[in-house]
């Protein structure tokens, strides 16, 4: 009896000790990741700075408390609390409101996570610097996806669906360029990159800002991450067809100071929408897309291994300085607030037999950021703009009585197809492939 009692007491002691050790093992550690630049106008109340925070503690985080230290005013804010509806185990993005500085220019703000779930933050580095720029004009950020594709590629419908869905959902923020390789829609527009940077890659190769590969089926995470970045330059572009050539003018406004040793130039890509041919058959991986919810995948569902009658948009036709930008198109010093303009010409447009309707031509102007490391140059897309080529009366395809630009569909902001326009904002898609946001 005494032995049994001692055994039970020993077990209780072990259990209590284990519980005590478990309680002591709880840790509360949240570390903010490096934050990028944010731009804010003196007239803005604040702008939201996206910051990723990582949970290194033992439990899912329900709440954090933080302070902001403003180097401009040399003052710390009152503690602010963020509650998370869904506690997070690993990484979470938070939006931190940043007020404009007292004067134009750069001034840092320190974001410091002081508490985690009501406990002092135990991580070694609890803060990060936010690089705030107070500017008269902030750059309008647009994200460029380049999709290397081919009719022969059975997995390439993924790129088609991603590119067209992002253009439908974010017509003001997204620019897509479709680069065909080894098929009837192939051109020389990207030959320099297809023979070098992208020569030994699988298809489709979908690049976001030439910085990250897109490996998902909707491209949303890449797009939103890039859109949150602050661009150092604002850019606009216009293009006019004179009956023979397309004359292009880009206007670039430096909005932020840039790092020494980083160079910028402008590249230009001529693209075409609405390309169709009854002989063009797109290879299709049967069954690959059946679980996808974006409506752009619907045409690829079913049992057709080759699809005919598709309309191809955003197709690269010609380019100028596509890999590194046109040399000298932007010149140092990149003085904040001082506009730089540049002109190029796409000559003899009639040589491009792939073009079917000159009223569906676009010019994309890409600001190429170049960082040299030894004998290698890393080139990414800092920002971009796109315009429809103004053809006047010269290149417009005549529309017959049965070819009006009719509405072909209504969509909600999250991509769901609607039978009729919804109350609020509806995305309207037209027969020519264009989209427009309409408020009802």
Which residue stretches match the model-derived regions?
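Short, conserved sequence motifs used for protein processing/export or organelle targeting and
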Residues: 175-392
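Bacterial Sec-dependent N-terminal signal peptides
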Residues: 1-28
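Intrinsically disordered, low-complexity Pro/Gly/Ser/Thr-rich segments with frequent PxxP/GP/PP motifs
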Residues: 74-102
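Residue-level detector of functionally pivotal "anchor" positions at catalytic/ligand-binding pockets or at interdomain
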Residues: 27-34, 132-143, 385-414
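Terminal connector regions
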Residues: 102-137, 365-374
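Local sequence-structure signature of Cys/Sec-based thiol-disulfide redox active-site neighborhoods
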Residues: 135-174
